Amino acid sequence: MPQRLVDLHTHSSVSDGTEAPAALIASAVRAGLDTVALTDHDSTAGWSEASAAVAGTGLTLVPGMELSTRLGLNSVHMLGYLFDPAHPGLVAETARLRESRLHRAERIVERIAADYDLTWGDVLAQASSGATLGRPHIADALVAKGYAPDRSAAFAGILHWRSGYYEPHEAPSPLIGVRLIREAGGVPVIAHPATRGREPNVSSEGFEALVDAGLLGVEIHHRENTTAGKARLLELARRHDLIVTGSSDYHGDGKPNRLGENGTAPEQLDRIVDAATGWVPIRG
C-alpha cells in the first residue's frame, strides 16, 4: 500500500494565501494529498468552508492555525492542531493579534508612502474580505504597483526587517502560545524554527522550556529550515520524544512552495490526532 501523503501547513486567503479555503481543498485533492491541515495566521475563519469542501473528496482535513508569538526580536510561529476554536483564551488572543497586525500594517504603509506611490487602499485591494491583514498584502500591493517582481522580492527589499519601513509586531511569548493551544485541547508544534538567516530561532534552553510548557512537536521537514538546523532539531525531537512534522507552507501563488513538497509520516499524524482533545479531523 502506498504511503499516505500528509501536508500539515497551508494558508488560504483568510490570511496570506491566495486561494479561498474551498479552492485550497481542491488544490490538495489535485496534488494527490490524503491529508491536509489548514493553518491560517491567527485565524480559524476558514475552518467551516474548508470542512464543507472536503465532503466526498476522500481527503482528510486537519483544522489548525499558525499562532504568532515573539521571543525578543525573533518571530516564532506556533502551529496548533485540532483545538477548540471557541476556547475563550485563544479567541481573545487571536483577536488581539489580528488587531495588532492591522495597525502594524497601517504604520508600515504610512512609512512606505513617504517614498513610494502606495496607499492603504492599494493594500486593501489585495486582501479578501475578512482576511487577517499583514505584510504579505503590502508585498502584493508593491508587486501590483510595479515596485517588486514578486512577493519574495518585496520582502527581500522594501519590506526587509532592516529597511527603514519595518515595524515590529506585538505577540505573546512562545510559552504563552504553547499553553493557550494546550488549554484549548490542541497540539502545539513549533513551525520551521531553523529558518535560513535566523537560525536558531529558539535556543536549546528555550526548547527545554517550551517542552516543559507542553510543546508536543516540531516542524522539521520544511524548505526554509537549514540542513544543519534540521539535524539539530531531529536530535532535540529524539531527546524529548517530540512529534516530527513536515509540510509545504503552501500559500497558493503567494510563494513558490508546492503542496506536498514535504510531508509528515502517517504515524506522526496519528500522534497528533491521539493527543488532541479539542477537535477532530474532518474526513471527506
Give residue ranges: language-model regions.
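Extracellular/periplasmic loop regions
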Residues: 258-262
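An N-terminally biased module of ancient metal coordination in phosphate/nucleic-acid-related enzymes
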Residues: 1-74, 159-160, 172, 178-179, ...
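Extended substrate/RNA-proximal surfaces in nucleic-acid metabolism proteins
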Residues: 53-211, 263, 268-284
